[in-house]
Amino acid sequence: MSFNTIAQWFALNSDLLLTATWQTLYMVAIAGAVGFALGIPLGVILHTTKKEGLLENLPLNRALGAVVNIGRSVPFLVLMVAIIPVTKLIVGTFIGTTAAIVPLTIGAIPFVARLIESALLEVPTGLVEAAQSMGATPLQIIRKVLLPEALPTILNSVTITLVTLVSYSAMAGTVGGGGLGDVAIRYGFHRYDITIMAVTVVMLIVLVQIIQSIGDALVRRVDHR
């Protein structure tokens, strides 16, 4: 394939691919932001209400843990179909980029919660005990000890979540969710266009690599251990 042929192909398909890329970024950004806003506090609650936790409350911990486990165990495609009524209630439709954000967000929340819970478990108990001995309240310990000490792992969890959301957004495209996954299915698979299928796969890989590289750089910057 000559350079002119490649240039012509990209000229013909650039608008389609750029639009799909922005749709993917839009889905991942909104779902990630809401997922973190709800998942991080949920993870903190799971950690602090466990046995011998700062706010020990085993019934609450078990109830929330069960809900989180159920949320994590449902495959994303099944989740998308199962919550169609909820998606229609919130967005007004279950097809399209904005509609895909609803299941993406619901899928992200329990995922983030468990990652945050695991990140907080890495904080040495000695630091928490030292803060308690100085009279710090549970909220002060969470804000000034647990979260700052776990920040590198939390940032790594954010990176993992965003990468996962990219793959989920591609799956959303198989049922009309828009984005690069939608282009790969509609134009690559249904029209038997191997070139556009390959290009969308490469673009997804590049997007994941960019997210991972930025995440790794941020972790290195804040990790002073």
From Swiss-Prot:
Keywords: Amino-acid transport, Cell inner membrane, Cell membrane, Membrane, Transmembrane, Transmembrane helix, Transport
InterPro entries found in the cross-reference section: AA_ABC_Transporter_Permease, MetI-like, MetI-like_sf
Subcellular location: Cell inner membrane
Major location (coarse): membrane
One GO term describing the cellular component: plasma membrane
Transmembrane segments: 25-45, 62-84, 101-121, 160-180, 194-214
ABC transmembrane type-1 domain location: 21-212
Topology in the lipid bilayer: Multi-pass membrane protein
A Gene Ontology biological process term: D-methionine transmembrane transport
Entry function: Part of the binding-protein-dependent transport system for D-methionine. Probably responsible for the translocation of the substrate across the membrane.
PANTHER family per UniProt: ABC TRANSPORTER PERMEASE (PTHR30450), D-METHIONINE TRANSPORT SYSTEM PERMEASE PROTEIN METI-RELATED (PTHR30450:SF1)
Name of the featured protein: Probable D-methionine transport system permease protein MetI
Organism: Vibrio cholerae serotype O1 (strain ATCC 39315 / El Tor Inaba N16961)
Organism placement in taxonomy: Bacteria, Pseudomonadati, Pseudomonadota, Gammaproteobacteria, Vibrionales
Gene (name only): metI
